[in-house]
């Protein structure tokens, strides 16, 4: 849930892990990562002739409003899965693409020490023996969604709301004899821990 124009996820770095407590606690300074997700406003608008709306005895316009409600309910899923489809070419909190062969991982959680590149993107080499041609078919994903922090972040700022403009003295109802129904919401999607997701560019089979 979001309550501002944008949210910055400064904790999206490598979390410390537990160690045996021997002697004094070891204080670890977390690496800071300024990863912001800015909310966007989305809308869907339908204009209907006021005469047609007044004469709608059979309720032919009711399915339109039902569809607007269905679309609003499905929209978060559309955003999330579009982000997933683009995740191998969109940067996450460490500056690399979310699915990338070279995520920088450091020895210490403050971002110091030896850096080791870690991959969460596997691309199968295809062709004859020794070939270096990348697999170009559809990829598939393996994700751990059991944790509190998810691989993908859906940030909701304002739930969908339906507004009707039907005042005959103002707006398009006055100028064009139309009644306008508009649905809007504010939200956005971004990337969480790449460590919880793996993209496989390879056939999904028993091999």
Predicted regions and their residues:
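Short active-site-adjacent helix-start/loop capping segments
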Residues: 18-19, 54-56, 186
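Sequence/fold signature of self-assembling virion shell proteins
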Residues: 102-207
């Amino acid at each position: 849930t979001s309550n501002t124009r944008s949210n910055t996820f400064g904790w999206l770095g490598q979390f410390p892990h537990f160690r045996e407590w021997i002697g004094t606690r070891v204080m670890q300074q977390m690496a800071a990562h300024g990863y912001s997700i800015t909310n966007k406003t989305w809308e869907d608008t339908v204009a209907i002739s006021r005469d047609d709306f007044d004469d709608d005895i059979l309720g032919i316009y009711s399915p339109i409003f039902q569809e607007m409600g269905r679309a609003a309910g499905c929209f978060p899923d559309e955003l999330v899965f579009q982000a997933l489809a683009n995740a191998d070419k969109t940067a996450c909190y460490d500056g690399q693409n979310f699915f990338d062969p070279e995520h920088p991982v450091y020895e210490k959680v403050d971002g110091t020490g030896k850096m080791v590149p870690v991959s969460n993107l596997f691309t199968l080499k295809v062709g004859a023996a020794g070939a270096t041609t990348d697999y170009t078919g559809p990829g598939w994903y393996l994700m751990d969604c059991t944790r509190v922090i998810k691989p993908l972040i859906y940030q909701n700022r304002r739930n969908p709301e339906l507004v009707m403009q039907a005042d005959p003295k103002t707006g398009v109802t006055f100028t064009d004899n139309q009644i306008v129904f508009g649905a809007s919401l504010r939200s956005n999607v971004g990337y969480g821990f790449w460590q919880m997701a793996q993209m496989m560019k390879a056939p999904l089979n028993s091999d």
